[in-house]
Amino acid sequence: MPLLARLAAALRAPAPPADAPTREEPRRPARPNAPDGAANHVVVVLDSCRFDSFVRAKPRFMSRLGEVQRRWTYATWTAPSHYNLLIGLLPHESPRNVYASDYYKQDFLRFKERLNFDVSFADMVPNLWLPGYLRSVGYRTGMYVSMPVLNPATPINRDFDDYALMDRHNDIVPMIRRMRFYEERPSFYVLNTGETHYPDATPDEPENHWPRISGVNGVFKHLDDHLRAGRAVHAREAEAFFDGERLAQLHARQVNAVQWVDRAFEELLDTVPPNTWVTVTADHGECFGEGGYFGHGPIQHDKVLEVPFVEGRVR
């Protein structure tokens, strides 16, 4: 059974019998009313999407949000990158001649524009956890993920009203349709979508058309499991499996995946209510042979660190 299917089965265990004792959940304080005018915020994370792939795709709908920027991720792998995002550290601009502490402060202040109220990051101490803070000021929170390393049993699933590992790793549409927005309080959502993660397959592509490359110790090993965590592949090991044409094809698949997500993104723009701020970015990039690297993770290379970033208020 593929890795994703095994994890999904384990995480979707049958419900206990009706007479089974229930575990008492810790009491949460009553959720207050949100600040007046507080905005909904939706963060879309295109897993493994390179900045240049995004630019080559020329996304029509995502680009409506604002200027497409090249930014830099704080981490080269999915789990730590999402942790950074959830403490409020979105991909950075790599500014020169600026103290890091000053940049953090300026970057956090951007949340006042995104959320449309006077955000107090002093209130995030000591938890340093954006979903928890937003719940404490009246938000509903949700996160839908494609990657098994972010499954609901992991520590990332904290302070969310709705958190789910989706049935398919490469389809943002069910995430969009699962989101709920309310008149009485704003919502915060994170959507981790995997169309742009290897094998860069869109939902309309038959699985037997996906690329199959076996026998390599690294990111493209275990492709029957499809979505194992990325590992570096040394150029000597990969030489027999990857030539320039093959790598170009793999990169082109990611560009095509961005275009597919962009078409689906039109539905997201139609779904969210007025006063919603949407951010689109990636958790990390991907190497397609540059510098002798393949994949992401334990790789120090610009193409793994460069990510797209675009955001803005909808209507």
Name these PLM-found stretches.
Residues 1-315:
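Catalytic domains that recognize anionic headgroups
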